[in-house]
Amino acid sequence: MAVKIKLQRLGKIRTPHYRVVVADARTKRDGKVIENIGIYEPKQDPSVIKIDSERAQYWLSVGAQPTESVAALLKVTGDWQKFKGIEGAEGTLRVAEEKPSKLDLFNQALSEANNGPTAEAITEKKKKAREEKEAKEAAEKAAAEKAAAAEAEASEEAPAEEAASEEA
């Protein structure tokens, strides 16, 4: 039985995803397979290529013939070079950068927001309560300023009185 390593197509019309499979050469593209040995997603940047190297080496050693596209994938991953004993067995596979975790993104957004929203939801009750609170705080602040001013005046007058009493 002639065995081939080929691509089995998955996905929607313009978003192809492939499985790298081992199947009889006479079966349809999406027909029955012997073993699934990897995946290939060409639309990602960089393309996602995950092939089980051990299984690919086994099937190549027992005589499975890769199609042209699978042979190109095996060269990128370095499996073809391992099989043939050629230098450059590490391949030229590009790996996508790791994305930050959602928890890290959340914590970063939380720190940027200074631990709270900048604007509150406003309803009539909340608006009145906020205005009353602001008025009360303003009155307290004004009273505190008056008390501080009176204290400052008293302290300014007291040394003058002491100086006058010393002169007399």
UniProtKB/Swiss-Prot annotation:
Sorted alphabetically, the Gene Ontology BP terms of this entry are:
translation
Q: Which positions are tagged coiled coil? A: none
Segments carrying the region annotation (Disordered) are 110-168
Indicate, by first and last residue, each region the UniProt record lists as having compositional bias (Basic and acidic residues). 129-144
* Acidic residues composition-biased segments: 153-168
Keyword Metal-binding in annotation: no
Alphabetized GO MF terms: structural constituent of ribosome
- Decide whether keyword Ribosomal protein is in the record: yes
What InterPro entries has UniProt attached to this entry? Ribosomal_bS16, Ribosomal_bS16_dom_sf
Entry keyword set: Ribonucleoprotein, Ribosomal protein
What's any one GO cellular component for it? small ribosomal subunit
Q: Which PANTHER family match?
A: 30S RIBOSOMAL PROTEIN S16, SMALL RIBOSOMAL SUBUNIT PROTEIN BS16M
Q: Which family does it belong to?
A: Belongs to the bacterial ribosomal protein bS16 family.
This chain belongs to the protein called: Small ribosomal subunit protein bS16
- Gene from which this protein is expressed: rpsP
